[in-house]
């Protein structure tokens, strides 16, 4: 009975994200808030994949037990030509995959590429790990995974 109560809300989160994506004409399954992403991961219904660079994960932090497939590499953020193959090797094309980057922009591009490659349930984590820039040109003061107090660690 408790399991059903957990499954119902997370299923509803995905359906709502799909509906919003369809209305917006997004080329991937949709976007979810950091809080909804964490609920989906905790329920076991989704896998979280961090698409930031190794350097970002090392110096800024990362979500425990998240997978890592870099969308781009190095300080110049050169696109990883193996991204789709690496993602498929780690998740398969039919898993519910939540992609996380710094602010939600790169992960949206990664979600689009994955969807074009045949991933059927790939979602963007809105706001990203650090969030959007504020008026002072700093991240983390108004939104993002860390701002919401969700689990993260740093090397």
Where are these regions (language model features)?
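Short, surface-exposed ligand- or partner-binding patches at beta-edge/loop junctions that are enriched
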Residues: 99-100
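Structural scaffold elements adjacent to functional motifs in cytosolic proteins
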Residues: 48-50
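Rhodanese-like catalytic fold shared by cysteine-dependent sulfurtransferases
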Residues: 1-46, 55-96, 107-155
């Amino acid at each position: 009975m408790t399991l059903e109560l957990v499954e119902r809300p997370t299923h509803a989160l995905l359906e709502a994200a799909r509906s919003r994506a369809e209305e917006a004409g997004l080329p991937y399954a949709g976007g979810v808030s950091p809080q909804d992403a964490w609920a989906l991961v905790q329920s076991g219904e989704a896998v979280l994949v961090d698409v930031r660079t190794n350097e970002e994960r090392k110096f800024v932090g990362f979500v425990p037990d998240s997978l890592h497939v870099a969308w781009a590499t190095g300080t110049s953020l050169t696109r990883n030509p193996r991204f789709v193959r690496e993602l498929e090797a780690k998740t398969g094309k039919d898993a519910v995959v939540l992609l996380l980057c710094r602010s939600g922009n790169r992960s949206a591009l990664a979600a689009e590429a994955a969807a074009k490659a045949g991933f059927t349930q790939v979602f963007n984590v809105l706001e990203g790990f650090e969030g959007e820039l504020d008026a002072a040109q700093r991240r983390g003061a108004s939104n993002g995974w860390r701002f919401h107090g969700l689990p993260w660690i740093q090397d």
